[in-house]
Design a protein with these regions (language model features):
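Acidic, surface-exposed loops and disordered segments
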Residues: 2-304
């Protein structure tokens, strides 16, 4: 039985071009669904896979002779990217410089972002790994300061509509979700909602900061909840490499996740989305001279 997503309910189809095949068996080795086996010294499609081909493309990508064609589940042989000419892969030092130098940017120049850069950011984001192919991430792209502001104010209007949940009389209800949730709502969500409402009344946008570009990544109910966050991270790093600043905004999705039907219909946001994140982009107004060394809450090692 095929694994269902919002985009497909079929298995991928594996076709061998045997006059190109050298029977090396690499395709069989990399297929963790066990969709492929060696039989009579050649790879064939197994009749007893784990799930059935999910069209991850691993077998097609590892084949040295282009002897495999995957189709279905939004995959085709045309999706192959030749890696033989990619000689300038990023070194660790280059990558570290990129991530250490990146700051969360909320102050932007009054400068539009070129369409070419927007396309490059999306191109990088769609290459992010996902829990199950094909990607079930949905993306809303808001181009231009005015469109970002319009979306922001629509969200802030909804914030105001549900602000009673964060009032002094009702904030206690979050105890039902646990002590940690209550403390987070009391110390963060309650003052944030009040601040955003007050500043919106003054025509100020402290939700998405009047960025010239925003992208809203959401997951479908079928996808891994982490998928939109990973895609958003790829987009953020791509933007940094292109000279743009960015910042993740996590307050939008949890607030509108279980309601805001009118808003979601207007902005083509999937109604039932378990997770989501907004990223804002723009040319940084200020340049930072230093990076910040970070740490995890804890790191535990286990070794042989």
């Amino acid at each position: 039985m095929a694994i269902i997503t919002s985009r497909t309910n079929k298995n991928g189809r594996i076709t061998f071009i045997y006059d190109r095949c050298n029977s090396c068996g690499l395709c069989v080795n990399v297929c963790k669904d066990f969709s492929l086996i060696m039989e009579d010294n050649k790879p064939v499609v197994s009749s007893h896979p784990l799930f059935g081909c999910i069209a991850c493309g691993q077998c097609m990508a590892v084949c040295p002779n282009k002897a495999i064609d995957i189709s279905g589940r939004e995959m085709s042989v045309d999706d192959l990217i030749d890696l033989s000419g990619m000689k300038n892969k990023t070194s660790y030092d280059q990558f570290k410089n990129l991530i250490v130098g990146r700051r969360s940017i909320r102050d932007f120049k009054e400068q539009k972002i070129e369409e070419e850069l927007i396309d490059q950011i999306i191109e990088a984001a769609v290459s992010a790994p996902m829990g199950l192919p094909p990607s079930d991430v949905h993306l809303v792209v808001l181009k231009g300061k005015d469109k970002v502001r319009e979306f922001s104010f629509d969200v802030l209007d909804y914030f105001r509509k549900i602000s009673w949940v964060f009032s002094d009389r009702m904030i206690w209800i979050w105890w039902l979700a646990g002590n940690e949730t209550y403390k987070l709502m009391k110390s963060f969500a309650q003052p944030l909602v009040r601040f955003l409402a007050e500043t919106k009344d003054k025509g100020e946008n402290y939700l998405l900061y009047d960025a010239p570009l925003a992208m809203y990544f959401t997951a479908s109910p079928y996808s891994d909840p982490a998928d939109p966050y990973i895609a958003a991270t790829y987009a953020m790093l791509a933007a940094e490499s292109l000279g743009l600043g960015s910042c993740m905004i996590g307050s939008v999705h949890p607030t509108i996740q279980y309601g805001a039907g009118k808003l979601k219909r207007k902005w083509n946001i999937p109604y039932k989305s378990p997770s989501g994140i907004v990223v804002i982009f723009g040319y940084p107004k200020y340049r930072f001279k230093s990076g910040i060394k970070r740490s995890f809450a804890n790191v535990t090692y286990f070794a042989n």
